[in-house]
Amino acid sequence: MSAFTPASEVLLRHSDDFEQSRILFAGDLQDDLPARFECAASRAHTQQFHHWQVLSRQMGDNVRFSLVAQASDVADCDTLIYYWPKNKPEAQFQLMNILSLMPSGVDVFVVGENRSGVRSAEPMLADYAPLNKVDSARRCGLYHGRLEKQPQFSLESWWAEYNIDGLTIKTLPGVFSRDGLDVGSQLLLSTLTPHTKGKVLDVGCGAGVLSAALASHSPKVRLTLCDVSAPAVEASRATLAANGLEGEVFASNVFSEVKGRFDMIISNPPFHDGMQTSLDAAQTLIRGAVRHLNSGGELRIVANAFLPYPKILDETFGFHEVIAQTGRFKVYRTVMTRQAKK
């Protein structure tokens, strides 16, 4: 997180304008500009645990990771700098939450890559903080307005749900496959056999659909679920509760907060971090699994067929097998043996 993103580079073109500002940074915080920006005071709020990990090393208690911001997170701030994510409902959720806590008259800046859909900020905030475009560079747009009217925000109104095989899946903006089961997870689910036993870790759990489906036909499994996303953690907890299932759910950057070993690790690992393509999480998952699997334990993941996971699996475990595939996706399976590189 040392190099600045294009969005941050656009902000830096205007750094002189912020020297006296007390800023809350929020949104898709892909670098450590909030910790390094020259201003009167800097706070940050993020829904992404891995972004909090980086920023908290430099900002301490002035950065907070949570599903929703609280009044204390915006205290004394006179400026919001919001980094637009690629997910429009996620942006709307976060902006309505934060702006409902800030007083009228605060400066509102929205910055993001054009391909992320940052232009949507103008109509989204038209009734609250009418925006004007103040810069365009690095294929990004920077918008500014002043808060004229606080939006109303109620967390309950943002919950959604869908049903699959008799299970209720609870979701929130920003959760992967919020509108229904994705094809990759569906393929992975098709490989999970009834009466699975032991400790199962679901990495990158999203809305908790993999764990809920597994537990519904394998009641003896002991579930642990983790994700970097605060909305995903809350959605997974709600999904388990809605279906009368039990499991431990917490935020973790892949294995960063995971303790102990498991009999199975399942995952539909992401290969994007915001707008950027990144295989870091999947590589960390595969290489780190050897430290969290019992002997004979199994790693089972689904991925786009074009991604180079077979090589990493073979380098780490010594072998892999494809147990299901379509034209776009493959389900990989490997087992913890003596030849695995611990």
Swiss-Prot record:
Principal EC category: transferase
Keyword Transferase listed: yes
Keyword set, alphabetical order: Cytoplasm, Methyltransferase, rRNA processing, S-adenosyl-L-methionine, Transferase
Gene3D superfamilies (UniProt xref): Vaccinia Virus protein VP39
Reactions listed under catalytic activity: guanosine(1207) in 16S rRNA + S-adenosyl-L-methionine = N(2)-methylguanosine(1207) in 16S rRNA + S-adenosyl-L-homocysteine + H(+)
Chief place of localization: cytoplasm
Pfam families tied to this protein: MTS, MTS_N
Location of this chain's protein in the cell: Cytoplasm
GO biological process entries: rRNA base methylation
CDD domains in the record: AdoMet_MTases
Disulfide bonds: none
InterPro entries linked: DNA_methylase_N6_adenine_CS, Mtase_sm_N, rRNA_ssu_MeTfrase_C, RsmC/RlmG, SAM-dependent_MTases_sf, Small_mtfrase_dom
UniProt GO cellular component terms: cytoplasm
Molecular functions (GO terms): 16S rRNA (guanine(1207)-N(2))-methyltransferase activity; nucleic acid binding; rRNA (guanine-N2-)-methyltransferase activity
EC number from the UniProt entry: 2.1.1.172
Protein role: Specifically methylates the guanine in position 1207 of 16S rRNA in the 30S particle.
Family the entry assigns: Belongs to the methyltransferase superfamily. RsmC family.
Quaternary structure (record): Monomer.
Official protein name in the record: Ribosomal RNA small subunit methyltransferase C
